[in-house]
Curated annotation (Swiss-Prot):
Uppermost EC category: transferase
Binding residues annotated for ATP, in chain numbering: G9, P10, A11, G12, A13, G14, K15, S16, T17
UniProt GO MF annotations: ATP binding; CMP kinase activity; dCMP kinase activity
InterPro entries assigned to the protein according to its UniProt record, in alphabetical order: Cytidylate_kin, Cytidylate_kinase_dom, P-loop_NTPase
Hydrolase listed as a keyword: no
Localization (cell): Cytoplasm
Full protein name: Cytidylate kinase
Cystines in this chain: none
Record-level GO cellular component terms: cytosol
Keyword Mitochondrion: no
A biological process term (GO) from this entry: pyrimidine nucleotide metabolic process
Stored Gene3D superfamilies: P-loop containing nucleotide triphosphate hydrolases
The enzyme's E.C. designation: 2.7.4.25
Length: 226
């Protein structure tokens, strides 16, 4: 049994933090697909490539080297992990991620990684598009207010000047765009386990997911040895 874990959910639901910890626990590769879209957004903005410039975006994606190392995203040899979390990227990433050609190119890369490695992958369309046959699918949720508060605290810890009100408005806007886009909209896979993280600590969610994965692996091993 290949261990492929899909973790989907809206911004601020705790996907990345939880996915990293689950990947570490099971010694799996962690793929932050959101970081990939953020990286493209960051690079496109720096080159003045708008979301409507499809050809420019495709040329950009095809011209770069992108990989993950120690939970960091490296693009053309440069660590962009901090740059892609800044407000100007966060407020525009959904617009770039909604471009069909952008999603097609990045989804192909993500699918290729899932074929080559056992992975924990988080995003918005992992269980529905990227890894529809993954044996482990989870959909994390939380109230917009809680998600905004988490993002606010995260950015404040990085000494970024942010306002809670602006973050909440941005999250509500992103929820709408992500859920209503024509290409790979944010939605729960039919066979995904939904976990509301509003009143749970990160460690509790990781423990819940880990136990579900472990129990399935044990059952599968028992079935094979019979």
């Amino acid at each position: 049994m290949r261990v492929l874990v899909a973790i989907d959910g809206p911004a601020g639901a705790g996907k990345s933090t939880i996915a990293k910890l689950v990947a570490k626990k099971f010694n799996l590769m962690y793929i932050d697909t959101g970081a990939m879209y953020r990286a493209i957004t960051y690079l496109a903005q720096n080159k003045n490539i708008t979301p409507s410039n499809v050809e420019g975006l495709c040329n950009l994606i095809n011209s770069i080297s992108m990989y993950f190392k120690d939970d960091k995203i490296i693009v053309n040899g440069e660590d962009l992990s901090e740059e892609i979390r800044k407000p100007n990227v966060s407020s525009n990433v959904s617009l770039y991620a909604s471009v069909l050609e952008v999603r097609t190119l990045l989804v192909d890369i993500q699918k290729d990684l899932a074929c080559k490695y056992e992975v924990v992958m988080d995003g918005r369309d992992i269980g529905t598009v990227v890894m529809p046959h993954a044996p482990f699918k989870f959909f994390l949720t939380a109230t917009p207010e809680i998600r905004a508060d988490r993002r606010y605290k995260e950015l404040k810890e990085k000494s970024q000047k942010v306002e809670y009100k602006n973050i909440l408005e941005e999250i509500i806007k992103r929820d709408y765009i992500d859920s209503n886009r024509k290409v790979s909209p944010l939605k729960k896979a039919k066979d995904a386990i939904e976990i509301d993280t509003t009143n749970y600590h990160i460690e509790e969610v990781v423990d819940k997911i880990s136990k579900l994965i472990e129990s399935t692996i044990i059952k599968e091993k028992g079935r094979i040895t019979k």
